[in-house]
Amino acid sequence: MSIQIFNSLSRQKETFVPLEEGKVKMYVCGPTVYNYIHIGNSRPVIVYDTVRRYFQYKGYDVKFVSNFTDVDDKIIKAANELGEEVHELTERFIAAYFEDVTALGCKKADVHPRVTEHMADIIQFIQVLIEKGYAYESAGDVYYRTRKFNGYGKLSHQSVDDLKIGARIEAGEKKDDALDFALWKAAKPGEIFWESPWGNGRPGWHIECSVMAREHLGDTIDIHAGGQDLTFPHHENEIAQSEAHNDKTFARYWMHNGYINIDNEKMSKSLGNFILVNDIRKQIDPQVLRFFMLSVHYRHPINFAKDLVEAASAGLERIRTAYNNVKHRLTTTVSLGDHSDEWLNKITEQKAQFEEAMDDDFNTANGISVLFELARIANIYLNETNTCKKVLETFIETFEVLGDVLGIEFAKEEELLDEEIEALLQERVEARKNRDFARSDEIRDHLQAQGIILEDTRQGTRWKRG
């Protein structure tokens, strides 16, 4: 089955057909780096990291670009409040961003372009729009002529006339029409600026992504993605800029993930329910956070609540336990039976079910349901009188491959503490005294599976980490 993507542009699922066979060009709007990212910011990072992983699983060569907005009103304000230089602030929070998303199991993009590295490209792009009549200069600012672009509103499914009703010109703005938006902003006293044909200033927010996407992926890209809140005006304005400049379709598929609520309320600083990833990942296993985020389809809203996160933690533990039990059986069983086509077919069927779920607009919720079923089947198999090496290995491989698509690690076991090892060894001594050799061997095998090497001597049992 081909991959089906819900395209925000058409508001329906479409079969994914890449611009270039076997390749995917994908752009995801990244953060404005003036603070740590909150859990709402983390959802698109996790979602589109998973989308990228699934494309790679299906054999596609993916070029994945995600930007940093490293100059912006919020950044300038934060730098002034903290008494830092803008570049110092942004460097600090870019480093913090990578720490957070790496903890969440996300891979780095192939390119993480920064606005400040593309000023010449941005200025040149704006000049072309002016030459084509799509933009105009006004007292040091440059604005986009929204009404000149015939397709404006096609992504957010709004008409220009409807948008006009709520639009207004703010004090100090020097634009011809309330719908026009800034491509270049004249510098205010004391602000960071770059030289341009229109005077000192810096770019508007929307122009940045149009330029960086074009520079790193070309005039037309396969997939442009981001949070639902970016649909309008940000992505709508990107389309207007890019298609006016390039005379080509900007992006063929638009993907938008849903919002995150906290205990059924919108997350906001005023409500005091603003959760930073940097804080929450110290309280909750980041893998549990990722598993939780993927337990709901990406287009649906998700409610972050303690009981739901705890349920996700218990669910992930069920799958990990099944995986580790299979792995333990493989390393400890001396006599293994002949392989069974019946069980191998059951595993293959689950893998096919997983692909069917992910092919259907990256339905990770259904994909996780498949992992639960795989764990259930594995537990049933482990109760068989004879188990087969081939089947056990196939279970392990399938857990690991499907887990990797979701960015979930099943193999990672917490290292036993010295005190836990000593307690198990004491229990083993008692078992041997009571001639409970089965329990003694079970403890030995469990420790060996965790890389603990035992040496029985006349003075007692010594141990070391392998």
Swiss-Prot record:
Reactions catalysed according to its record: tRNA(Cys) + L-cysteine + ATP = L-cysteinyl-tRNA(Cys) + AMP + diphosphate
Cofactor note: Binds 1 zinc ion per subunit.
Motif 'HIGH' region in this chain: 31-41
Motif ('KMSKS' region): 266-270
An annotated Gene Ontology molecular function: cysteine-tRNA ligase activity
One GO term of the biological process aspect: cysteinyl-tRNA aminoacylation
Keyword Amino-acid biosynthesis in annotation: no
Superkingdom of origin: Bacteria
GO cellular component terms, A-Z: cytosol
Binding site for Zn(2+): C29, C209, H234, E238
Cofactor: Zn(2+)
Keyword annotations from UniProtKB, A to Z: Aminoacyl-tRNA synthetase, ATP-binding, Cytoplasm, Ligase, Metal-binding, Nucleotide-binding, Protein biosynthesis, Zinc
The UniProt record lists the keyword Aminoacyl-tRNA synthetase: yes
One Pfam family hit: DALR_2
Subcellular location, record wording: Cytoplasm
Predominant cellular place of this UniProt entry's protein: cytoplasm
Stated family: Belongs to the class-I aminoacyl-tRNA synthetase family.
PANTHER family, alphabetized: CYSTEINE--TRNA LIGASE, CYTOPLASMIC, CYSTEINYL-TRNA SYNTHETASE
Quaternary structure and partners: Monomer.
Name this protein carries in UniProt: Cysteine--tRNA ligase
